[in-house]
Amino acid sequence: MQEIAADLGRYSVDAFEFLHEGLDYTVRKIHGPPNPVADNILKWLRENGIDPDNLDALLEGAELPPTVAGAIEQMGGFAAIRDRMNRHVAGDELCWGLRDLALEKWGVMAPAVLASWGIRSTKDFGRLVFALVDNELLQKQPEDRIEDFENVYQFDKAFTGAYKISLTAAE
């Protein structure tokens, strides 16, 4: 991450670490907790250089090891496993998830913390994501574009209007 941050020159390593944490937060928020069986199947596919889109054909042709085929059947078949393996989030979804996480962590100080790392707009989130994609640390879908991160929200409004401070009477 340090090399990528140095190459870009505008973001702190902390920005990349927050992005990683925020991606996990957003994926869990949208798709629920990870499924160990689906994760193991994905790991096997990656290790064997197999495109997940080819999984159905391999399953139908009985070309999968029995343990992998059994795991797919255990999950409810190809359609069910495909849905569980899809942990993709769109650019705008990630931006909102990053905002929510920042508010949980830092409250009204969230914009200042992010700015100290070089993040001042949702486009900055996109630049971070695509730097990781370019360095093969993240994967993207064919339809994913950096423009998906442009003007998702305005920082000055998204962070200040969303955080509520509650006051309770002292006893």
Feature locations, PLM:
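Short acidic (Asp/Glu) and glycine-rich catalytic loops that position anionic groups and cofactors
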Residues: M1, F78, W106-M109
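N-terminal, charge-rich interaction modules
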Residues: M1-N54
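Generic amphipathic alpha-helical segments used as scaffolds and interaction surfaces in large
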Residues: Q2-V13, M85, V89, S116-I119
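Short, charged early-sequence alpha-helical segments and their helix-coil boundaries
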Residues: N54-A62, S116-W117, P142-E150
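Intrinsically disordered, low-complexity acidic Ser/Thr-rich regulatory segments
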Residues: L59-D100, E104
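Amphipathic alpha-helical packing elements
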Residues: R87-Q141, F149
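Long, compositionally biased
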Residues: K140-E171
